[in-house]
């Protein structure tokens, strides 16, 4: 509880220092906190009830949504705060944090503005490749060492990354719902 409180305090401090205008628009704050709470609850639920694997959850959707409606810096910081909160309930938080941060950065950098669906396909593909590359590096460091025995690779994880990328494609229709719910306008509509 203390860890989550400190992270949220840091996030609020960032908003107060650099994004005071978000306090004027209630939709901005509502969107940010709704996304943080949503991803944290989903992660805790999946870990507690041992449902699938958390790598199926499209965490990169969070910075994409915030990037489209707000800005890149806020998208990155919100993503970092959410990933750190979600990592509390995991068995291997270090691997999770590095993988998700890399995927989130790729999602932010590959998507300047979302005006066509093809941009989201490209972003989803880049996110999948990032997940796979980071996880492959982890596997080389931990499981295989420097050997080239690829039969020891955990193929299931790569399947989770592909499912994650497919779920990431649902960002586009979700943006319409979020626009109506929180009162935003974007280039998507």
Predicted regions and their residues:
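Selective detector of the "anchor" transmembrane alpha-helix that sits immediately C-terminal
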Residues: 2-18
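Generic detector of multi-pass transmembrane helix bundles and their immediately adjacent loops
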Residues: 16-26, 37-189
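Loop-to-helix transition at the N-terminal end of transmembrane alpha-helices
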Residues: 28-34
């Amino acid at each position: 509880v203390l860890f989550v409180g400190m992270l949220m305090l840091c996030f609020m401090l960032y908003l107060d220092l650099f994004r005071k205008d978000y306090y004027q628009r209630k939709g901005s704050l509502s969107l940010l906190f709704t996304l943080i709470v949503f991803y944290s609850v989903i992660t805790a639920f999946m870990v507690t009830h041992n449902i699938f694997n958390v790598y199926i959850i499209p965490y990169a959707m969070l910075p994409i949504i915030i990037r489209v409606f707000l800005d890149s810096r806020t998208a990155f910081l919100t993503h970092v705060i959410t990933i750190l909160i979600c990592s509390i309930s995991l068995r291997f938080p270090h691997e999770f944090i590095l993988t998700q941060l890399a995927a989130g950065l790729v999602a932010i950098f590959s998507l300047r503005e979302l005006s066509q669906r093809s941009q989201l396909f490209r972003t989803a593909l880049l996110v999948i490749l990032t997940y796979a590359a980071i996880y492959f590096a982890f596997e080389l460091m931990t499981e295989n060492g420097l050997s080239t025995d690829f039969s020891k690779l955990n193929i299931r994880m790569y399947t989770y990354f592909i499912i994650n990328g497919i779920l990431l494609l649902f960002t586009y229709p979700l943006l319409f719902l979020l626009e109506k719910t929180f009162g935003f306008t974007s280039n998507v509509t």
